[in-house]
């Protein structure tokens, strides 16, 4: 039962989502692996399940978009040589944030031209962002009236949604399946009490990803928001191209403290960052004088490529 398998977990959303950014009125349409992992841990605790499979064996990617039959992966941070003086070509590549799985190897080889890059960007039409006005029952203005506020949300089109890849042994994947089916109803992301973030979940074989995931190459592309341990950090940074993003948020546990408390700020390499030296990453403790540990998932899920 120790053989590792990779599964594709597909989320089709039944309601708008609120994936928080800096302001409540903002909302993203994707989420990082650590947000999903926190939701899995909370659900496992509520069901009184053993956490060892999640903590020790599970490796997941960030959640990436799909549209119809196309699954997208983050654009790797590599230099693509365009035609000299072709400014429109430069802009077309700059607009790209994701690359379809079927075009990923071509992109790494520099075989996608600016026209195809523009078509890829246009194909990433996933849904619509909007603002919803809510009324706070707690906050009131100087006239004693309830204070309105705006919530950013994103509604996926029927044939679009998010997916992630999960790696683990059979027992770990079995527990993941139990937890994901429970999360369908409680939802994922912010404003779940208002019905946001509910989805239908299917778990499939990794299929069209297999050839990409099995290839070897001279560069490693990060598919999860991750951070190296102190022991790994120096070696992995040599010649790496990466973006760092700040990860923060509030502790959701009701037993951690008597009031709402923020987690320690944490910085992670963004998905799409490229390295010549792989690292494993780990799950970090970001608690800050609370009653128990608070986990921040930062394990690395890799895709190798040739450039």
UniProtKB/Swiss-Prot annotation:
Keywords: Antiviral defense, RNA-binding. InterPro entries: Csm4, Csm4_C, RAMP_III_fam. The keyword RNA-binding applies. The keyword Transferase does not apply. Encoded in a type III-A CRISPR locus. Belongs to the CRISPR-associated Csm4 family. Part of the Csm effector complex that includes Cas10, Csm2, Csm3, Csm4 and Csm5. This is CRISPR system Cms protein Csm4.
